[in-house]
C-alpha cells in the first residue's frame, strides 16, 4: 500500500506521522527539532536516521519545518532524499504547514503562536502575503518568547505585583543574575523566555479560583492584561495588512504597488482566523477576547499542534 510520511518540525521537536493511502495513521512518534539554520547536514541526517527505522518505506514524504526558507529548501530536499531514496519529497515552511492544517484548501488568515510568532494570508493553495515576524528581539508579538520578555520586564521593574516576582523566582529556582545570564549570555534565550509561559498560565488559572479583591485574582488580572496587550500588537502589526488587502479594490491595489495582484473576490472578504501553537492553545481566552470581541474577527480553529490537520489534509490529497 502507498504510505505517506508527514514531518512537522519546530525548533524544539519534530512530530512524525506515517499514513496509509486510506488516511489511517499507521505510526506516530517524535524526535528532536530539525532547523536547517542551526544544524549541519550531518546533524540532520543523524536525527532522521536515528528515529526513522520504518517497517515500511514511504512513497511520499512531506516535510514542514521552521527555518525552511526558499533558500533552504533544496538543502532539506536533498537530505530527505538521501534518507528516503525511493520517495517523492516535498519540503515546505511551517507557515504553509499551519495554513494547510487550519484551512485545508479554503482561504483564511493562518497564524502561529508558539515560542515564536508568524502569520500569513492563505488563498487555499498558496501564501499570498506574509508579514515578516522579525524574531523575538525585533518582533514576534504575542509569542511565548515575547510574553516571557514582558513578564521579566514587569517583575524586575515593578510594574507587575511583587508577589508574582517572589512566586516566579521560587517556581523557577532562579535568581536575578542567573536570569540575566540566561537571556544575554547563554544560547537559546528565546526558549528560556518562552519557558516562563507555563508559570504565567498557571497563575491565571489559580487566580480565577479566588474572589474579587484577593491578591491572587489581582496577580492573574495583571498577567491577563499583559497578554491582551501583546495579542493586540500581534493583531495590529501583522494581521491588519491582510484584512485591508482583502477588502481593497483592484484600483486601490494598483495604486499601492506595481505587480501586486488583487485578492480574488470569489474567495470572499470576511476571512476567518486560525491559530496553531501552544500559546494560542493555553491563552485561548485572551486571544478570543482581542480577535473576536475587540476586532470582530472570527477564530475558526485553534490547534495546539498542526499534525492532526496535516494528516487530514494529506489524506484528502489522493495519489
Range-by-range predicted roles:
Residues 1-60, 79, 83, 102-109, ...:
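ATP-binding/phosphotransfer module of carbohydrate and carboxylate kinases, centering on a glycine-rich
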Residues 62-69:
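Polybasic, low-complexity association/targeting segments
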Residues 66, 96, 184-185:
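Short, solvent-exposed loop/turn elements at beta->coil junctions and helix N-caps
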Residues 66, 115, 278:
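Cofactor-binding loop segments of dinucleotide-utilizing enzymes, especially the Rossmann-like FAD-
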Residues 69-166:
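Phosphate-binding/catalytic loop of phosphoryl-transfer enzymes
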Amino acid at each position: 500500500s502507498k504510505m505517506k510520511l508527514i514531518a512537522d518540525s519546530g525548533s524544539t521537536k519534530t512530530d512524525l506521522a506515517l499514513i496509509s493511502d486510506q488516511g489511517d495513521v499507521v505510526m506516530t512518534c517524535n524526535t528532536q527539532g530539525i532547523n536547517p539554520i542551526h544544524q549541519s547536514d550531518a546533524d540532520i541526517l543523524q536525527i532522521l536516521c536515528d528515529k526513522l527505522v520504518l517497517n515500511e518505506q514511504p512513497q511520499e514524504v512531506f516535510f514542514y519545518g521552521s527555518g525552511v526558507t526558499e533558500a533552504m529548501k533544496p538543502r532539506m530536499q536533498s537530505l530527505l532524499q538521501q534518507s528516503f531514496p525511493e520517495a517523492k519529497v516535498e519540503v515546505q515552511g511551517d507557515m504553509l504547514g499551519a495554513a494547510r492544517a487550519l484551512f485545508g484548501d479554503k482561504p483564511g488568515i493562518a497564524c502561529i503562536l508558539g515560542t515564536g510568532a508568524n502569520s500569513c494570508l492563505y488563498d487555499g493553495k498558496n501564501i499570498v502575503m506574509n508579514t515578516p515576524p522579525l524574531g523575538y528581539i525585533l518582533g514576534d508579538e504575542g509569542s511565548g518568547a515575547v510574553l516571557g520578555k514582558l513578564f521579566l520586564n514587569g517583575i524586575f521593574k515593578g510594574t507587575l505585583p511583587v508577589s508574582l516576582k517572589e512566586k516566579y523566582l521560587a517556581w523557577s529556582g532562579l535568581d536575578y543574575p542567573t536570569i540575566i545570564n540566561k537571556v544575554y549570555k547563554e544560547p537559546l534565550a528565546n526558549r528560556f523566555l518562552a519557558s516562563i509561559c507555563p508559570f504565567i498560565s498557571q497563575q491565571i488559572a489559580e487566580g480565577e479560583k479566588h474572589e474579587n479583591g484577593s491578591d491572587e485574582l489581582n496577580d492573574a488580572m495583571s498577567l491577563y492584561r499583559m497578554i491582551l496587550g501583546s495579542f493586540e500588537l500581534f493583531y495590529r502589526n501583522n494581521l491588519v495588512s491582510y484584512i485591508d488587502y482583502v477588502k481593497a479594490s483592484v484600483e486601490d491595489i494598483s495604486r499601492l504597488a506595481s505587480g501586486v495582484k488583487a485578492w480574488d473576490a470569489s474567495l470572499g472578504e470576511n476571512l476567518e482566523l486560525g491559530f496553531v501553537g501552544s500559546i494560542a492553545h493555553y491563552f485561548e481566552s485572551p486571544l478570543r477576547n482581542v480577535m473576536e470581541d475587540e476586532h470582530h474577527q472570527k477564530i475558526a480553529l485553534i490547534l495546539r499542534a498542526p499534525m492532526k490537520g496535516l494528516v487530514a489534509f494529506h489524506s484528502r490529497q489522493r495519489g
